[in-house]
Amino acid sequence: MAAATGSLLLRAPWSGIFSAHPLASALSIAGALFCLALLVKVLFFSFPTDNAYLAGGVSPAVTTGQYALCRHPGVLWFAGFYLALFALTRTSQMLWAFLLFTAADVLYVVLQDRYVFPKTLSGYADYQKTTPFLIPTPTSLRAMLRKQP
């Protein structure tokens, strides 16, 4: 995906993007960077730093921070990143990348949520009952704000 995204960005018609819509372009770049930063944070800095994931055993489910917002917040930031890139480039290729990559990510987390995490994360069944799958709710937003790690 990274190579495809890089290729799409390199082939985008950059000469007209900034001159025609400078504010929209700046907001799109800011949105893409914001979503990318949140994606990196949720994927790499939201888990315990001990060797729990390397031991091959069952680890506790993370239920604080962004993981109180929904069970798979990375999907939100991933989709937001590609949506911002589409808004920036305004190309049909980036629209297709947004749609296909996001659909693949959703399929991946459905499989994780149904088959992998219930077996590898302790307390995941309870977490599924209290936290929305993908779409945050006002209740989950309040929970996220209360449960900062």
Task: Label the predicted regions.
Residues 62-73:
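Short, amphipathic, aromatic/basic-enriched membrane-interface segments that mark the entry/exit
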